[in-house]
């Protein structure tokens, strides 16, 4: 790796975000949450802005990290295509990260974290993590009142992500 400067791209949901990090330290973040999923209009502009405003170019990157889903198929294609183009042009590695893992690691909760991504209708993509370790498989799931029953007994849990309200309504029944 040329440097430890990482460009992170997330386009799996209605949120389009680009961030720069050095090692584990976040340098900058640009994001927009737009229900019209206008990632193709924003992503390349965000990449240019974040690099330019921090006095970097794509040649300074050590790698690019991109969300691999689950999530919006079109959003994922846009993010992965941009990431692959940058990596190919600069001969740097591409790292893919689970969208659910990104959500789980954004919380400092001491207990079981259930990241969710709305999959439309009555479905969400979900998984379960304990202290950054996945304890259940990523899967699309039709939410029913028993969906997370194995985690609700004697555990502190938090449900995060844009599918959380759908889960909360059904689980409380």
Question: What feature does the model see in each segment?
Answer:
Residues 25-27, 80-86, 123-130:
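Short, basic/glycine-rich phosphate-binding loops at helix/coil junctions
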Residues 63-94:
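DPxDG-like acidic metal-binding loop motif
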């Amino acid at each position: 790796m040329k440097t430890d400067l990482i460009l992170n791209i997330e386009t799996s949901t209605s949120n389009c975000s680009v961030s720069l990090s050095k090692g584990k330290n976040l340098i900058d973040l640009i994001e927009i949450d737009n229900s019209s999923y206008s990632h193709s209009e924003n992503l390349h502009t965000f990449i240019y802005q974040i690099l330019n405003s921090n006095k970097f170019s794509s040649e300074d990157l050590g790698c690019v990290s991109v969300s691999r889903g689950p999530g919006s198929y079109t959003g994922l294609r846009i993010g992965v295509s941009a990431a692959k183009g940058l990596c190919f042009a600069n001969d740097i590695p591409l790292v893919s990260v689970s969208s659910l893992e990104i959500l789980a690691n954004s919380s400092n909760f001491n207990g079981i974290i259930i990241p969710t991504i709305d999959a439309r209708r009555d479905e969400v993509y979900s998984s379960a993590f304990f202290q950054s370790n996945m304890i259940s498989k990523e899967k699309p799931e039709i939410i029913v009142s028993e969906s997370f029953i194995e985690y609700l007994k004697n555990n502190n849990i938090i449900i995060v992500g844009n599918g959380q309200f759908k889960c909360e309504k059904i689980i409380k029944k």
